[in-house]
Swiss-Prot record:
The chain crosses the membrane at residues 9-31. It holds the Pfam family Ycf9. It comes from Euglena stellata. Its main location: plastid. This is Photosystem II reaction center protein Z. It is a multi-pass membrane protein. Keywords: Chloroplast, Membrane, Photosynthesis, Photosystem II, Plastid, Reaction center, Thylakoid, Transmembrane, Transmembrane helix. SUPFAM superfamilies: PsbZ-like. PSII is composed of 1 copy each of membrane proteins PsbA, PsbB, PsbC, PsbD, PsbE, PsbF, PsbH, PsbI, PsbJ, PsbK, PsbL, PsbM, PsbT, PsbY, PsbZ, Psb30/Ycf12, at least 3 peripheral proteins of the oxygen-evolving complex and a large number of cofactors. It forms dimeric complexes.
Length: 32
């Protein structure tokens, strides 16, 4: 049960980072 929660947390973190990187990349390309 603990492993399942940890895996979900890691997956959520990966998705969050992917979205942040995408937003930052879009802002940089827009500014430049």
């Amino acid at each position: 049960n603990g492993w399942n929660e940890n895996k979900n947390f890691i997956l959520l973190g990966a998705v969050t980072w992917a979205i942040l990187v995408f937003i930052v990349g879009s802002l940089n390309s827009y500014v430049i």
